[in-house]
Amino acid sequence: MRTIFNAKIGDAAYIQDELSSSLSSSVASKFKEFSKRKRISDSFSDLSEELERIGLRQMRKRIKLEKSFERTPKKKVQTKKHLPPVRKKDSVKRRRIIIASPSDEEHDGKVQTNDDSSENKTEKPKNQSNCSSNASKLSEAAQLLNVSEEKSSISETELERSRQVALNELNKSERFNKTETQLDISVMEVDSSDHDEEEKTEKVGAKNNRSLYEIVDSDDEEEQDQDQSDAAKPAESENHSEIKKSTSFMDQMSGAKGNKSVYEIMDSYETEDPKEAGKNEESDKDKPAENGKSDKDKQAETEMSDEDKPSEIKSPSTIKKSIISTADEEALLAELASSDLSHLEKMFNPLQKSRRQSLHVPSPELAAKNPKLRRRSERVEVGNDFCPSQSFVDMVAEKKRQKNKRKRLSKSLSGAPEDLEEMEIKHERKRLKSSHGASTDSMEEDNENETMTVAEEHHSDGEVSNGEVPIEEKPTTSSEKPSASELPEEGNSAPPALKKDVKRLQAARQAVSHAVNLLAPPKATEAEPRTLSRKLSPQPPVVDKKSAKQKKKGKKKQKPQEASPLKSSDEENHGHRIRTNAGYVTVVDEPPTKVPIIELIKTSSGMVRVEPCTPKQKYFRELPPTPKMHGFREEPGPSGMSRKRAKHAAPKVEHNSAKQAALRFKEQIFARRS
């Protein structure tokens, strides 16, 4: 560059060409290097991002798996290291069962993949030289992740399926969402070739990884149970449920298989159907999901699972126990079905008011044979030798017929059915007294005549009906009682027609009285007619008399308010007192004109008003038209002379003009005579 700048100024074009060529070559080389580095860094960053994404995905899957493992039961397969050491006094050959545990393989694979992912996360590129190694590591990690993903997908689907089975087997009451329907168990569709390959790999894994169980001969069962109970105590704190299941499994195996060799047991287990094995696995998974249930539910489930297992595994003792328990239950159910439990309904009912009764209730057969008798007199009827007379039979039949009749009782009435007719008669008399208290003897006679005519009509109707229907002759002697079914028919065949007619008459009367009350004004009912009007009116009073309380209220008349005496002060009596030159003049109000009370007379046609001009007495005299009759008031005359003397000897009147003028003036002012 220096050489170029030291050249002549005239060679500007040359300098420009040289500069551009040198710059372009250097920039191009640098740009190439930069783009190369950029490409590598971009590829590495892309790889790192991809790795992070895969790692996050894997972490999420791992968390999901852990959660599903918590929900769903883990396979509790007891390996040899968990099994407590069994001490035996006599040296007996122990037979071993080898069971595959594929969960260990999955666990190892997961640990490896997690370690690789954690290592890959921590690694970051620092120089260009590390890029190739990092890329190779990344590709390896991706391959491992893909492999682990393939493995975990199968296990995840299996776990999900088992979880759904467990949730379906839960009762509806124990679910959180009680309205939710049963979960649909999605069935996996797998190609047959892939499935066969997986089965082969599983079998190989099962052969490689097997756990051991010790099974002792059936001769030493008792000693083994004792040793197991002794050995189980320290291990209970760590894995209580696992030890219980393992011991029960060992007991079943020892009871069922007896003194078989190792190979026979292995063969029998290997030859089991794969479906049954899958069922057992599912039941094992379901057990921890239902840990929230009570101990009773657990016991019931264990019994059910024992029943579901094949009959080869069950020992004869357990079979006997189950048969005995079922027989007991059946017997108990049969007893309950046969016994009468009606008393239990009333026993704990708080609304049922009764005496304290013992729980022992006699059977219905005994109660039907020996009925409890209320009175000693009724015990006579129990004997079969009792032969009643015809009159007694008729009397019983009549009583039953009377009882079967419909009786209309008011709420206030209460009495035995025998006294009903007497009570009704008394009630009717009281009502008649209250309504017809003011009526005279003639009215009562009319009433009696009406009722008699009604009765005669009814009697004549009865005679006609009896004449039409032939009378049945009663049997003279009959030792047997009439059947209960015949008695109510007799009661229904002869209804009381007289009562119906009387009721119709009463209803008609009530309707007429109601119409009259509507026609007459309400004030008319207040004033009662006098003795004369009663004598004039031959009809009984239609309107029912008021009750005693209303009468008392009516008697209490309002007292007339007495006017206070006039005071002399002008302030108070300024409206009634006028001051004049002659003196004070008091203005007195006219007395209120008496309104004539209109009286009423009850006639056959109805209520009649009495006008004021109608005479009130039998005999009367006509009064002369005097000024007093027209409202004038008399005042006493001048004192000193009697009227007789004034008539016979008139006094001499002195004509004084001045005096007369003064009197005239006085009259004009005061309008009064002295």
From Swiss-Prot:
Residues 127-137 have a biased composition (Polar residues). Residues 73-97, 400-410, 548-558 have a biased composition (Basic residues). Residues 216-228 have a biased composition (Acidic residues). Keywords: Phosphoprotein. The modification Phosphoserine is found at S248, S358, S391, S414. Residues 65-137, 168-321, 352-382, 395-585, 618-659 are annotated as: Disordered. Residues 233-245, 272-312 have a biased composition (Basic and acidic residues). The keyword Phosphoprotein applies. This is Slender lobes-like protein.
